[in-house]
Amino acid sequence: MSEKKQPVDLGLLEEDDEFEEFPAEDWAGLDEDEDAHVWEDNWDDDNVEDDFSNQLRAELEKHGYKMETS
């Protein structure tokens, strides 16, 4: 129990803290399509009667949550 622990050398960890420099890009000068679609128009799934929804509804009702149906 009289052994003293050697301090841990953290020199290698500190080297990882440096960041790589990248040249600045001119994004303002790019021609962009005004009508570009970022995602599909039908991204919102309106089908609330699929298997997952039914299982989730049943599980929530088991825990006391009352689900409203349209």
From Swiss-Prot:
Instruction: Kindly list the biological process annotations in GO that this record carries.
Output: double-strand break repair via homologous recombination; mRNA export from nucleus; proteasome assembly; proteasome-mediated ubiquitin-dependent protein catabolic process
Q: Which Pfam families match?
A: DSS1_SEM1 (PF05160)
Tell me the keywords, alphabetical order: Nucleus, Proteasome
Indicate where this protein is primarily found: nucleus
Which GO cellular component terms, listed alphabetically, does the Swiss-Prot or TrEMBL entry include?
cytosol; integrator complex; nucleoplasm; proteasome complex; proteasome regulatory particle, lid subcomplex; protein-containing complex
Tissue specificity statement from the Swiss-Prot or TrEMBL entry: Expressed in limb bud, craniofacial primordia and skin.
Record bears the keyword Nucleus: yes
In the UniProt record, does the keyword Nucleus occur? yes
Record family assignment: Belongs to the DSS1/SEM1 family.
How is the quaternary structure described?
Answer: Component of the 19S proteasome regulatory particle complex. The 26S proteasome consists of a 20S core particle (CP) and two 19S regulatory subunits (RP). The regulatory particle is made of a lid composed of 9 subunits including SEM1, a base containing 6 ATPases and few additional components. Belongs to the TREX-2 complex (transcription and export complex 2), composed of at least ENY2, GANP, PCID2, SEM1, and either centrin CETN2 or CETN3. Component of the homologous recombination repair (HR) complex composed of ERCC5/XPG, BRCA2, PALB2, DSS1 and RAD51. Interacts with the C-terminal of BRCA2.
Function as written in the Swiss-Prot or TrEMBL entry: Component of the 26S proteasome, a multiprotein complex involved in the ATP-dependent degradation of ubiquitinated proteins. This complex plays a key role in the maintenance of protein homeostasis by removing misfolded or damaged proteins, which could impair cellular functions, and by removing proteins whose functions are no longer required. Therefore, the proteasome participates in numerous cellular processes, including cell cycle progression, apoptosis, or DNA damage repair.
Entry protein name = 26S proteasome complex subunit SEM1
Provide the species name.
Homo sapiens (Human)
Question: Gene name, please?
Answer: SEM1
